[in-house]
């Protein structure tokens, strides 16, 4: 298992913490959010103290890497608010998709951040000049369109927000610093993301997926389905529609805004796509994601859509094929696991025992005080996971 080890909530206080940074805003910052916001501001201002006790020079660009549902928009607005109030920075918020800009604008108003900011499309021909450019879904920063935008705006500071910056080499070229903190598994355990069930099916074809969905539509609820090819998407759509389940295929050319509105309103039961909904799609009432067989990066992008919490859905669901290269349980442990065997779902009871042991261990660890021997601490070659910054 590769459950990411991340900053535990029981760790010692961070010397870079700015506890008053969200005062006056209608949010109660989560501990990891406060750490990330504080570290970002201090990196921009040249006040960041690294693990060696050295104060680092100001960074021109910082990227926040944090899972879907962890509140990246809130963190970005918090940083922008501080930089604008303290230094008078003009702020621009840029994204590839209009819905991301709309979400940022609504959060800014609703939460009382009151950041005076320009909303910028990544494809703007004449973008406004700003001092701080916030780049939503910053994994696109390696793309030529974003590089051109940088050249036109020439901001003093750039803040990137991303759940999964896979183009690691390109990202490192675009950002001076990359901040990581809590991963999906940790955020689920701490109650910030939804817990989930994991289902394994024998094969992943349009026919198989449609068959499983139509057999138990109430089990799956609002569902997002991913396929590799467009013809697979349309094949699955036809099968679902023939069975009386309203499904839509979302593409770059379809009326995506209307499709998403219909899905949220319950007029559409299922959305099918190749990859376009791996980003910028936020729907807490989404219950199930069918993830096509893929590697780790793409699997996390697809599955990550389902972890936003909803009061009526205590357990979300991820469905994968047994041949997938990266089962999601390698990223985050599921509360329950089911496998389709001999025409029925078989539960893996061991999961509940593992979860009980894990929770007990977490309680014991949280109540323990551990200190490294002075000699070991003085000569430690590698930082702890929560001390890392790149």
Segments predicted by a language model, with ranges:
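Conserved two-lobed SF2 helicase motor
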Residues: 108-132, 263-279
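Conserved RecA-like P-loop NTPase helicase motor core
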Residues: 139, 252-344
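A conserved SF2-helicase RecA2
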Residues: 184-194, 308-389
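Conserved Walker A/P-loop ATP-binding site and its immediately adjacent core
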Residues: 68, 73-108, 229-231
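Conserved helicase motor
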Residues: 95-100, 118-126, 140-143, 228-231, ...
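Conserved interdomain linker/interface between the two RecA-like ATPase lobes of SF2 helicase motors
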Residues: 178-235
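Post-DEXD/H (motif II) to motif III coupling segment of the RecA-like Helicase ATP-binding lobe
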Residues: 140-193
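Walker A/P-loop
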Residues: 51-79
């Amino acid at each position: 298992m590769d459950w990411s080890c991340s900053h535990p909530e029981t760790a010692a206080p961070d010397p870079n913490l700015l506890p008053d940074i969200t005062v006056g805003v209608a949010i109660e910052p989560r501990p990891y959010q406060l750490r990330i916001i504080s570290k970002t501001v201090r990196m921009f201002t040249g006040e960041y103290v690294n693990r060696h006790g050295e104060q680092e020079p100001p960074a021109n660009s910082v990227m926040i890497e944090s899972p879907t549902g962890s509140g990246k928009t809130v963190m970005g607005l918090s940083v922008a608010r501080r930089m604008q109030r303290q230094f008078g920075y003009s702020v621009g918020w840029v994204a590839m998709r209009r819905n991301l800009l709309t979400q940022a604008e609504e959060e800014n108003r609703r939460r009382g951040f009151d950041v005076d900011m320009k909303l910028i499309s990544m494809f703007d021909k004449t973008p406004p000049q700003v001092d701080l450019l916030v780049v939503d879904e910053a994994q696109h920063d390696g793309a030529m369109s974003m590089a051109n935008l940088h050249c036109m705006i020439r901001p003093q500071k750039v803040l990137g927000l991303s759940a999964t910056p896979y183009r690691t080499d390109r990202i490192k070229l675009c950002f001076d610093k990359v901040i990581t903190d809590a991963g999906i598994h940790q955020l689920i355990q701490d109650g910030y993301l939804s817990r989930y069930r994991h289902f394994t099916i024998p094969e992943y074809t349009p026919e198989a997926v449609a068959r499983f969905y139509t057999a138990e539509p109430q089990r799956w609820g609002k569902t997002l389905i991913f396929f590799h090819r467009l013809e697979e998407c349309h094949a699955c759509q036809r099968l679902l529609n023939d069975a009386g389940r309203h499904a839509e295929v979302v593409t770059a050319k379809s009326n995506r805004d209307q499709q998403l509105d219909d899905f949220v309103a319950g007029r559409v039961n299922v959305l099918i796509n190749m990859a376009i909904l791996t980003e910028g799609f936020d729907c807490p009432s989404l219950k199930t994601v069918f993830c096509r067989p893929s590697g780790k990066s793409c699997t996390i992008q697809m599955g990550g859509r389902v972890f936003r919490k909803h009061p009526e859905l205590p357990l979300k669901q991820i469905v994968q094929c047994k041949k997938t290269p990266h089962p999601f349980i390698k990223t985050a442990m599921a509360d329950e696991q089911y496998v389709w065997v001999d025409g029925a779902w078989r539960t893996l009871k061991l999961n509940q025992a593992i979860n009980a042991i894990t929770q007990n261990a977490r309680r014991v660890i949280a109540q323990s005080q551990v200190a490294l021997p002075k000699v070991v601490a003085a000569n430690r070659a590698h930082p702890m996971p929560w001390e890392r910054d790149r």
